[in-house]
Amino acid sequence: MAAARLAASLLLLAAQVACEFGVLRVVPQSGGTRGRDYCILYNPQWAHLPHDLNKVSLLKLRDLSTTQLCSHLDVPVEDFTNQIALVARGNCTFYEKVRLAQGSGAHGLLIVSKERLVPPRGNKTQYEEISIPVALLSHRDLQDIFRRFGHEVMVALYAPSEPVMDYNMVIIFIMAVGTVALGGYWAGSHDVKKYMKHKRDDVPEKQEDEAVDVTPVMICVFVVMCCFMLVLLYYFYDRLVYVIIGIFCLASSTGLYSCLAPCVRKLPFCTCRVPDNNLPYFHKRPQARMLLLALFCVTVSVVWGVFRNEDQWAWVLQDTLGIAFCLYMLRTIRLPTFKACTLLLLVLFVYDIFFVFITPYLTKSGNSIMVEVATGPSNSSTHEKLPMVLKVPRLNTSPLSLCDRPFSLLGFGDILVPGLLVAYCHRFDIQVQSSRIYFVACTIAYGLGLLVTFVALVLMRHGQPALLYLVPCTLLTSCTVALWRREMGAFWTGSGFADAPQTPWAAPQGPVPPKDVDASLSEQPRGEELAQSPLATEEAGATDPAKDPDSPVAGPLSPSNGDQVQPIPVVTPGTSA
């Protein structure tokens, strides 16, 4: 990125409300038993907490948890000298509480909250006036402290340093790159089989889902809908989050079925069919094994929906369903040209930057709309999270692991959007017989872009819009390969690959006299023999596509209705259409 853009991004990040987790170490005032740690939320703009517990002095906790400390009347006669004040949240601002505590000699302020913890905010002038730390403690943790240690305790506030890199990033990297590579490969192979294989209507279960070609109008409508939905989620999160969860359950079960169906069809058992009937869907007489598969996929989705908040294991189901959903979408949605790929990626590139870096200037809270929606608003009453992410718990041990942020996230959009470009590259590879150089290069570029995202995440210590790094890496790499091979014209327009069902091999130029079928097959290159191999395995009674004038893969020189044979341009590596 340009230096100016990076500087602007950093300035916008600084404008957001700072919020960090810390640790409250509690020991009994009488000594004896071992201490215990509790999670706190603090704002370092009031005052920073030390990172090393050994450099922190234990101070007495002054319990005024029944007082809100909003006026001088709430300050006890015996002030807070060399003590940490504990007060209740409410009735006045954080600044008023901490100003009174600091004026009474307190070395820190703990605010107990029965609601969800939120960052203790202030403004720049107030931050400069205050020199003691301010932190929030949950009411549940306070009750546990009193139950274990009583009301006479010594406490210390500190913020231990976290590991710069967590091993869960490796798992997220493998899942993301693997999904993009597998989805792109599957999408290209699926299209080739559809073009090369004569469609048959006598076996409904073997029919593949039709791909959906994306047009520029569809891209614009999609982006507008994304913006509209994101704003709705920002203002009506508690109501719409359950709608999103329901949609995810339905879509992910469909994706899981689509991924497992090809494997299940190869099993040698449960091939019996449903008896004749007039029921919806069942009138097609599906096989028993496919019904069992559908039941299994729905069950997995329902189990996740019921136990989605079980942090110990529900994330495994969510990631499995999410990967299946992404693979299904990459196979179903098709960008027909590189022009469409560029339009989609650039528009979503701007969309991602706007909702992460620009919206903090437009919201009253100063928070990013994208970050608020992705992580769940701090004032949400449901505490639900959107499921449209891959999530992996933190694997490194840290005192901060007791706080409520154990997962690293990667949104589905950061997989699907570049993945559609990877899928297009694979289809173009097959068209020009380029040994999959576009597919491999774009997949590697995606992996490098994801690594850059992780590095930025570590350096900036803040959630990053991954498309900021993924879009330039994948688009520039694809363009570079096309220019190097002198195929930019064909790569940009798709060379008619999406406009008509063509075979992936190039036809010879000019009229060529008919040849014996066996001789022509023997003269084909090895790559073309492999491409045509599905035709040799057609079931008995199927029509030979080469002899059927209505077949989409009929020979390019087969005249129909007296039309004159016309030469077809060749698209070969090293040339442009």
UniProtKB/Swiss-Prot annotation:
Q: Which residues form the active site?
A: D352, D414
| Spans annotated as Disordered | 502-577
Chief place of localization = membrane
Write out the annotated subcellular location: Cell membrane; Golgi apparatus membrane; Lysosome membrane; Endosome membrane
Under the heading InterPro entries, the entry gives: PA_dom_sf (IPR046450), PA_domain (IPR003137), Peptidase_A22B_SPP (IPR007369), Preselin/SPP (IPR006639)
Instruction: State which ranges are Lumenal (membrane side).
Output: 20-168, 238-239, 308-312, 363-405, 460-463
Q: Does the keyword Lipid biosynthesis apply?
A: no
The alphabetized UniProt keywords are: Cell membrane, Endosome, Glycoprotein, Golgi apparatus, Hydrolase, Lysosome, Membrane, Protease, Signal, Transmembrane, Transmembrane helix
Q: Where is the signal peptide?
A: 1-19
Instruction: Tell me the GO BP annotations in alphabetical order.
Output: membrane protein ectodomain proteolysis; membrane protein intracellular domain proteolysis; membrane protein proteolysis; regulation of immune response
Glycosylated residues are N91
GO-annotated cellular components: cytoplasmic side of endoplasmic reticulum membrane; endosome membrane; Golgi membrane; Golgi-associated vesicle membrane; lumenal side of endoplasmic reticulum membrane; lysosomal membrane; membrane; plasma membrane
Which EC number(s) does UniProt give?
3.4.23.-
Q: Pfam families given for it?
A: PA, Peptidase_A22B
**Processing after translation:** Glycosylated.
Q: Which terms in the Gene Ontology molecular function aspect does this entry carry?
A: aspartic endopeptidase activity, intramembrane cleaving; protein homodimerization activity
Task: Indicate how the chain sits in the lipid bilayer.
Answer: Multi-pass membrane protein
Residue ranges that the UniProt entry lists as topological domain Cytoplasmic: 190-216, 261-286, 334-341, 427-438, 485-577
Q: Domain annotation text? A: The PAL motif is required for normal active site conformation. The catalytic domains embedded in the membrane are in the opposite orientation to that of the presenilin protein family; therefore, it is predicted to cleave type II-oriented substrate peptides like the prototypic protease SPP.
What PANTHER family does the record point to? SIGNAL PEPTIDE PEPTIDASE (PTHR12174), SIGNAL PEPTIDE PEPTIDASE-LIKE 2B (PTHR12174:SF39)
- What is the similarity comment for this entry? Belongs to the peptidase A22B family.
Its biological purpose: Intramembrane-cleaving aspartic protease (I-CLiP) that cleaves type II membrane signal peptides in the hydrophobic plane of the membrane. Functions in ITM2B and TNF processing. Catalyzes the intramembrane cleavage of the anchored fragment of shed TNF-alpha (TNF), which promotes the release of the intracellular domain (ICD) for signaling to the nucleus. May play a role in the regulation of innate and adaptive immunity.
Q: How does it assemble?
A: Monomer. Homodimer. Interacts with ITM2B and TNF.
The name under which this protein is listed is Signal peptide peptidase-like 2B
- Give me the gene this protein comes from: Sppl2b
